[in-house]
Amino acid sequence: MSINLQNVSYTYQVGTPFEGRALFNINLDILDGSYTAFIGHTGSGKSTIMQLLNGLHVPTTGIVSVDKQDITNHSKNKEIKSIRKHVGLVFQFPESQLFEETVLKDVAFGPQNFGISPEEAEALAREKLALVGISENLFEKNPFELSGGQMRRVAIAGILAMQPKVLVLDEPTAGLDPKGRKELMTIFKKLHQSGMTIVLVTHLMDDVANYADFVYVLDKGKIILSGKPKTIFQQVSLLEKKQLGVPKVTKLAQRLVDRGIPISSLPITLEELREVLKHG
C-alpha cells in the first residue's frame, strides 16, 4: 500500500489566537513495502505528518492519497475509517491507550470495533500478542499490572490485531532501556521483512541507519533533504547544524577524515565501518 502527499499544508487551531502553520507544501511518496524514516528537530512537523497518514488529521490544503483513496480538507470521518484500518498508528507512549480489564480483551477490542467477530478477534489477539513476545500466562492479567515494556508491546499488538498494511511508528521506543528498544526494533524489522510498510519517526540516527531504506529530513514544516540513509548521512555538517546528528560510526569516521585519513564515503553502520577499516 503506497501513500502520497501532494502539496500538503497543515495549520492548527485555525481562527484562534494560537493559529500556527505546522506544514508547508509537503510532497512525498511512501512506497509499498518500504521502511521510511522521518527525522527532524522538535516542532519540525514529523508527528503532524504521521497523524495525516491515517486520517487522524486532514490537510488544510493539498491531498493525502492512501492506496489511491484521497483525504482532503473536506473528507468526512466515515470516508476515512477504512484508511485507519489499513494504516495503524503507534503513538509515542501507546500504553496510555490501554483500558480493558485484561490483556486479551484489550488487544481484541480494535478488530471487533471494525466488525470482526469476537472469536476471530480473540484469535487475532492471541496471534499478535505472541508476535510481540507476550506469553500466554499474561493474557488474562490486567494490562496495568505489567511492566512498562510489556504494556508497550500489548498496545502495539492491539494495533497489529487490526491487520494494517502500513505501520506508522511515532518514537516507538521512547523511554525504553537499550535491551527493550532493540527487541522492539527487531519486531518491526521482522514485520517489514514479511511485507508490511513501516513508517518511523525517531531521533535515534542509528535506528535510521540500521533499519530504514529511505529518509525524509524535516525542518520548520518543510522537507529539506530526502534520500537513502547512506546519502543523507554524508551531510554531517548540515544535520549537526539542525541539531539532528548522525549515526555514531559516521561521527567517528568524520573525525578520522578531519585528522587526514581519507574515507571516500562515510560509513553509517558498524558493518560498513569494519569494511572501511579493513580495506583502508
Curated annotation (Swiss-Prot):
Signal peptide residues on this chain, from the entry's feature table: none
InterPro entries attached to this UniProt entry: AAA+_ATPase, ABC_transporter-like_ATP-bd, ABC_transporter-like_CS, ABC_transpr_CbiO/EcfA_su, ECF_ABC_transporter_ATP-bd, EcfA2, P-loop_NTPase
Assigned GO CC terms: ATP-binding cassette (ABC) transporter complex
Location relative to the cell: Cell membrane
Listed Pfam families: ABC_tran
Assembly and oligomerization: Forms a stable energy-coupling factor (ECF) transporter complex composed of 2 membrane-embedded substrate-binding proteins (S component), 2 ATP-binding proteins (A component) and 2 transmembrane proteins (T component).
Protein name: Energy-coupling factor transporter ATP-binding protein EcfA2
SMART domains in the cross-refs: AAA
Superkingdom of the source species: Bacteria
Enzyme Commission code(s) on record: 7.-.-.-
